[in-house]
């Protein structure tokens, strides 16, 4: 029984080659593992490696198994023997297509020439292996094959095939695949610098565009909006204050100035900056008659409207604003319409206009934001409050 300690590199090489000739794949694998793959590229007769011996095996099944085993274990593909022949050159000479396919898959060179100047393509053309030659030209149709290369006798692969009457080889070399491979090789050779001439200077690279960045005005605008976001709730309560609204397209609004953005009705109510037309429209909506209301008179008009009709002109022209009038508890957040007057003879309507059913809905989208509480009323001041439900 063969043991690993009985093997040396010379004995291991002989045992491995004998296992290949006998078709013993397991024994060959055992020898490679025992010697740590040190004999995988060892030299035998005529300087040939085990891979060169494997491509010449007559049995196709054993040949494929041993060639794949050696290639997967790291055997060198393009090593040469004493005559400069490679494993691919030997496989093309014998016409072993399966071995040629494996060698090309593991980067076998089809243009490696031997001592006579013959390449694997020339060996396949000279020996009449049309299938092998067609596989080579198809595999290298993009990388290119120098089909016009001559050996030391001055013959090309096409001349070698034609001189020996190998029509299939001639057809493979002159067919579309052969022309494509020759054209690709010609393009590659034209791009190379001729001998003795320096390579052309590389063209200057185009300046790469800088990464896309936002314009400076837009960045400054975002910075201002981010800086004013935390101050938008604290300003705008006083009569002469400023309201800074944060967000995209934020603007600064001065209450005492005429230049203000177009605000919605809800925002106008919230800021207390309604125009005279808006105030009149709101007053008309608040005093609209509701016949079924318990607070309406027999004529269908609001009692508050009757009182206002007899009120002095100072009350009718009093400024209209919004205050968080409570519905039973302070700070309920319900926005109401408050009219202030200094006339002592106008009765208070606070008690009559309380409750959720005290008036029509003035605004459906009123803003539920917090506003400061009303100032304490002075002595002798009466108020008329008409609540506007949201």
From Swiss-Prot:
Gene, per the UniProt record: Ankrd63
Organism: Mus musculus
SUPFAM superfamilies the record matches: Ankyrin repeat (SSF48403)
Pfam families, A to Z: Ank_2
Chain spans, region Disordered: 181-213, 226-245, 320-377
SMART domains: ANK
Entry keyword annotation includes Hydrolase: no
Protein name per Swiss-Prot or TrEMBL: Ankyrin repeat domain-containing protein 63
Segments annotated as ANK repeats: 11-40, 46-79, 83-112, 116-145, 153-182
PROSITE patterns in the record: ANK_REP_REGION (PS50297), ANK_REPEAT (PS50088)
